[in-house]
Amino acid sequence: MKMVYKIGVSLLLLVIFSQYSTAQYTVNGNAQQVSCNQYRLTQEATFLTGSVWNNNKINLSNSFDFKFDVFLGNNNSPGADGIAFVLQPISTSVGTAGSGLGYEGITPAVGITLDTYQNGGDNDPAYDHIAIQLNGVLNHTSVNNIAGPIQAINGNDNMEDGQWHALRIVWDAPTKTITAYVDGVQRVTAVKDFVTDILSGDPMVFWGFTGSTGGEFNLQQFKTALNPYFHFSPGQRRCVNEPITF
């Protein structure tokens, strides 16, 4: 009876994880799911775009604290173009080609951009930079640029270093403050009533990542946190089709 119980629980958890993984995200363009929690936005090729959206809207009336790992590639010079974490109410199929990090032109939207290429037309700095930019507008002199640009990594001009970097996005609903951290260090923050000023009073948004390459390119990826609803022993693997032990 004990063995039957273990098998039954294992099968139940596998079903839950399978449904959770396959139904949770929509993948567009060049983007592809690499593993249960890892997504590629662009390959190392020119003029690509990709986006990955969570299918479940979140309510900006509530606070959130999202943690990811991001990979911006190995190519520093040449290398391009970057990625964006985006909040938008439109759909799970939006995204643009070419320059603009796959985010340009999406409106209404809130984007935290990680830009690895200096585009003069957007008044980009020479270093890899992070900013908070609204409504798919990437020009840093625009009123839609509400924080940054500053170095994406504190004290380091280059984020295309072949390393995974921790990206944390915190939204504090009572104070209407959004903050981004890279590798545990606060980089940009802004106070803005997104629901009233940007989203026409509707607090429900999709969240996701976009990315693009242009004439230069990089492999660009992100990882989500694994399913937090169950607690596992250290080293326990939790991907779909991998065995669960107790």
Say what each PLM segment does.
Residues 1-25, 239:
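Bacterial Sec-dependent N-terminal signal peptides
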Residues 230-246:
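Proline- and Ser/Thr-rich low-complexity, intrinsically disordered segments
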Residues 18, 195, 231-233:
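Compositionally biased, low-structure terminal segments
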Residues 1, 20, 94, 208, ...:
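A detector of low-complexity, intrinsically disordered, Ser/Thr/Gly/Pro/Ala-rich segments
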